Amino acid sequence: EGVPSTAIREISLLKEMQHANIVRLQDVVHSEKRLYLVFEYLDLDLKKHMDSSPEFSKDPRLVKMFLYQILRGIAYCHSHRVLHRDLKPQ
């Protein structure tokens, strides 16, 4: 049975993604029955960061800065022929 081909394809794509605005895949661990993807550690996800910063919604410059970084990450993915169908702040 092994690892599904979709998982292998996603892992190979994630290994190629090297950009400041994309969380990096650090390692892949394959045990007997499970496959573990080890990603770069981040203190907070975007949603928690936005919720913990009341000034976020009040400062248009801050919103633009975050949006710019998100769009740079998406543009990088698109330039490598990768589409992300599940973007969310978590």
From Swiss-Prot:
UniProt KW Cell division keyword: yes
Activity regulation annotation text: Phosphorylation inactivates the enzyme.
Alphabetical UniProt keywords: ATP-binding, Cell cycle, Cell division, Kinase, Mitosis, Nucleotide-binding, Phosphoprotein, Serine/threonine-protein kinase, Transferase
Active site: D86
Main EC class the enzyme belongs to: transferase
Catalytic activity: L-seryl-[protein] + ATP = O-phospho-L-seryl-[protein] + ADP + H(+); L-threonyl-[protein] + ATP = O-phospho-L-threonyl-[protein] + ADP + H(+); [DNA-directed RNA polymerase] + ATP = phospho-[DNA-directed RNA polymerase] + ADP + H(+)
MF-aspect GO terms: ATP binding; cyclin binding; cyclin-dependent protein serine/threonine kinase activity; protein serine kinase activity; RNA polymerase II CTD heptapeptide repeat kinase activity
EC number: 2.7.11.22, 2.7.11.23
Lineage: superkingdom: Eukaryota
GO CC list: cyclin-dependent protein kinase holoenzyme complex; cytoplasm; nucleus
Residue ranges of every copy of the Protein kinase domain listed in the record: 1-90
Similarity comment text for this entry: Belongs to the protein kinase superfamily. CMGC Ser/Thr protein kinase family. CDC2/CDKX subfamily.
Function as written in the Swiss-Prot or TrEMBL entry: Plays a key role in the control of the eukaryotic cell cycle. Component of the kinase complex that phosphorylates the repetitive C-terminus of RNA polymerase II.
PANTHER family: CELL DIVISION PROTEIN KINASE (PTHR24056), CYCLIN-DEPENDENT KINASE A-1 (PTHR24056:SF548)
Name assigned to this protein: Cell division control protein 2 homolog
Organism: Petunia hybrida (Petunia)
